[in-house]
Swiss-Prot record:
All the isoforms are widely expressed. GPI and TCS are the major forms, whereas SEC is minor and TCL is only present in trace levels. Residues 32-94, 95-159, 160-221, 222-284 form the Sushi domain. Belongs to the receptors of complement activation (RCA) family. GO terms for biological process: complement activation, classical pathway; innate immune response; negative regulation of complement activation. It comes from Cavia porcellus. This is Complement decay-accelerating factor. SUPFAM superfamilies: Complement control module/SCR domain.
Amino acid sequence: MKRGRPAALRCLLLLRAPALLLLLRAAAVQGDCGPLPVVPRAHPASASAGSTSFPENTTVLYTCDQGFVKIPGKPDAVVCISSRWTDIEEFCNRSCEVPPRLPYAILKSAYISKNYFPVDTVVEYECRPGYRKKYPIQSGKITCRDDLTWSTPAEFCEKKQCPNPGELVNGNINVTTDLLLGSQIFFSCDPGYRLTGEASAFCMIKGNAVGWSSSLPTCIKIICPEPPQIENGRIVNEEDTYEYRHVVTYECNKGFVLTGKSHISCIVRDDVGEWSDPPPTCRVKSPPVIPPQKPTTTSAPGTTTTLPTQKPTTVNTAGPEVPTTQRSTTVNVPGTKVPTTQRSTTVNVPGTEVPTTWKSTTVNVPAAGNRPDTRTTIKSTTASEEKDLASGYRTFLYGVGVGVPVIVCSLGLGVYWWIHRTSGQYETYENKESNVICHNLNESDATSEITSSDKLKKTHVYKVDSFACGASNHWLADIAKEDLRRDFSNAQNISSLLQVLGAAQTQ
C-alpha cells in the first residue's frame, strides 16, 4: 500500500501541470499587447521597441527612415487597446527639401506651412514688396524633380524705382548708381551755404510702394560776423551783411599809415563763416627815411662853337721885348658841403671847345730885329667833388670867376706889349690872301701863340715890322683891337655874372 501512494500522487501532479500553465498564461496576456507592428520606411522611436509585451493603452511613435519624410495627414504612432495595436499605414515617403528662399520673391501663402514635397510637386512664388513682375510676365513656379531637387527659378521680378528726388536749391544731388530700391543718394551745398537736414537718403519700401528714407535737405547761406572796426581808420562802403567771398576794404584816416592787409575776405571753415585775415592797424605816419644811394654821375654838356675854317696868316713885326713865358695857373675852388645822408655826386662840366682845324701859314716881313717868341698858356679851371648837381654847378661858376680874371690879366699884358712894342707879334684870323700879298709879308720862323686852354686855341700869328705898310695896313691893328675888345667884353659879362651869383649865395 505504501508503494502505491507516491505513484498516484505523481500521476496526479502530471495531470494538473498543463492546466496550471494554461491558467498562468491566460492571466499574463489578458489586456496586454504583443510585439510592435512593422511600418515601411519607418521605425519605432521609443527605447522599448525590442519588448514583446506592452501593457494596455501603451502608445509607440514611429519615425521615418533617413531620406524619407512624413506624409502630412497620416498617423505615425500605434496604441495598445484591448490587447491589440491600432492600425497604421505607410506614412513616410521621399520628398524635396523646403523650396529655396528667393531675394526678390516669396512662396505663396498656400505653400508656406508645408514640409512634404514629393517628386513632381509644384510650388509658386510671388514678388516681394518693392519688386514687380517683369514684362512679359514670366512664371514664378518651381518643381520637385526626381532627384529630389527643385528646378531653377527664373528671375521674374525686378526692383521698383523711387521717384525723382527733385532739385536742391543752392546745392547738388549725387546719384552714385540709380534710383532703384536699395540705392543711396547724397546731398551737398554750394560754397558759402550750409546743409540743414540729412546728408543722404535711401530708396526703401513704404507700404506696397517705394520711397526715400528722408526728405530733401535745405542749403542756408553762410553769413560772416561783422568785420572788426579799427582805430584811426574805417571800412570802405560798409554793409549790413557779409556773405561768402565778400571783401572788406580798410583805409586809414589822414596822417596815418595802414599796416597789414587792406583787404580781408569772408571765407567758410567747418560750415562757419569767418574772416581770412586779422584787420590791419593804422599808425601815425613817420617822416620818410631816405635810404643810402649810390653816387650818381651827371654830365652837363658844354657849348661847342664852330668857327668858319680859315687859314692862319703869320706877320712878323718888330716890337719891345715881351716878359718871359708865364706858367699855367690852376685854380681849385672847393664846393660847399651840404649835410645829407646821400653819397657824394660828381658833376663834370666840360669847357667850351673851339675847333682848331686850321693849317698855319707863316709869312716873314723884314723887321728891325727878331725877338724870341713868347708862348702864354692858360689852362681852364675844373670843378669837382660836389655833393649834388646844384652845388657842382655853383662850384663851376666860382672856378670860372677866379679863372676869368687870370685870363683878363694875361690879355692885358698882351695888349700892353702890343701897344708898346717896336717889333711885335699879333694873332688873328685872315681869310683874304690879298691883304697878305699886298704887304709883301715873308715867312719867318719866329712866331707868337696865345693858347687859352686845351679847348680854346688861337694859332694865327702876324709879324709886322712897326706896321710899316702905312695907311693900307691899318686893317691889322683894327683886327687886333676888335679881337681884344670882344674878349674883354666877354670877360666883363662873365665877371658880372659871378658877382650876381656870389651875392645870391651870401644871402
